[in-house]
Every structure is written in structure tokens, then in C-alpha cells.
């Protein structure tokens, strides 16, 4: 310490205990001050290792090339990739921007749902009833590159099944977006979305 005292830290030490469990829970963080994109890498790892499904809830969808490719590749190899988005946005600019990614994702087999009762603020990935992430990390540049974020990775715990059940309950209140829906969007929304995409890395 600054007073040059020697302190006994023993009372603050945690005793480690072995548990007989097949799974684990790992809290983690992501910061913009290093070169490691922890938040994005965890999401991409889940997409790349999924066998049956990856179900996602996110309030924003502003993707870089790596994440867009991972979503498309997972769907193209037969994984059920489903994304729940808000039906009513909090920020129209981000909402219109998100919709510019819909045609590419839908063409690759990604399923997109919009929560018709209102806004979705959850940031959730759940895959194959074995892995899940819940935290603060949105699917946008701000969360993935510019902000301090945190999340929890769950592997083979009972909570993973509960997260999937919540996803299914939420999806039951959603409208599944079709390519026809995308084509029939108002012209001004399409224009605003494409213009906003020019500054997507700032959002």
C-alpha cells in the first residue's frame, strides 16, 4: 500500500470448491481499449459451432462483415438461425438501418421476427439447448467496438433451457418477416436506411 504496510488478505480469499456439474457459467467483459473483439468473437463462435439452431434477441441489428458472414454461413449450412427484433423501435434511424440487412439475411435462410407488442431490449444468444449468452452486448458497432460491455456465457446449465423457453414464448407474439414485407416497405424508409448505412460504424 501507499503507507508501506503489509496487509493480510486472507479474510478476502475465496475457497474454491469442486462441483459435480456438467456445465459452467462464465461472466466476461469487452472493452474498446484492446484489439480483442471478445463480444463479437463469442457470438461468432456460437454461430460457427451450432448444429441445430441459434436463436437471437437483439434491439439493434447493425452488422459488420464478419458477423453478417457468420449469420449467413450458419443458415446456409442448415442451422435454424432466428432473430427477434423489435416491432416498435426506440430509434427510427437504427430501425431503418437494421432493415437494410433483411434482404441479405432472408435470402440466406435466416428467419427474422418482429415483436409486434412493442420493443425488445434483450441481448440473447441461445444455441442447441446447450449454450447461451445473456448480457449488454448489442449486435451493433457501438457495443462490439466502441463501448464497455459485459455478458455471461452459459454452457450446459438448466438456465439455457429456460432461456430458450423464453425465446419461444416471445416468438409466439411476433410477426415473421417475409421478403414481400421487405419489398413493400415505404420508399422513404428504404432511402433513410441506406443513407444511414453510410455512417453505420458510428452507430
What are these regions (language model features)?
Residues 1-203:
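Charged, low-complexity intrinsically disordered terminal segments
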Amino acid at each position: 500500500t501507499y503507507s508501506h504496510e503489509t496487509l493480510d488478505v486472507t479474510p478476502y480469499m475465496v475457497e474454491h470448491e469442486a462441483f459435480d456439474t456438467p456445465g459452467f457459467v462464465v461472466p466476461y467483459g469487452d472493452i474498446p481499449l484492446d484489439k480483442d473483439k471478445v463480444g463479437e468473437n463469442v457470438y461468432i463462435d456460437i454461430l460457427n459451432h451450432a448444429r441445430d439452431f441459434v436463436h437471437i434477441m437483439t434491439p439493434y441489428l447493425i452488422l459488420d462483415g464478419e458477423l453478417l458472414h457468420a449469420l449467413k454461413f450458419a443458415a446456409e449450412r442448415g442451422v435454424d438461425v432466428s432473430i427477434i427484433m423489435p416491432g416498435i423501435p426506440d430509434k427510427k434511424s437504427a430501425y431503418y438501418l437494421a432493415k437494410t440487412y433483411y434482404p441479405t439475411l432472408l435470402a440466406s435462410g435466416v428467419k427474422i421476427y418482429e415483436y409486434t407488442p412493442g420493443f425488445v431490449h434483450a441481448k440473447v444468444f441461445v444455441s442447441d439447448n446447450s449454450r447461451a449468452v445473456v448480457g449488454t452486448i448489442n449486435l451493433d458497432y457501438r457495443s462490439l467496438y466502441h463501448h464497455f460491455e459485459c455478458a455471461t456465457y452459459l454452457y450446459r446449465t438448466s438456465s439455457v433451457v429456460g432461456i430458450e423457453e423464453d425465446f419461444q414464448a416471445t416468438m409466439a407474439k411476433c410477426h415473421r418477416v417475409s421478403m414481400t414485407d421487405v419489398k413493400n416497405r415505404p420508399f422513404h424508409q428504404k432511402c433513410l436506411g441506406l443513407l444511414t448505412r453510410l455512417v453505420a460504424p458510428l452507430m
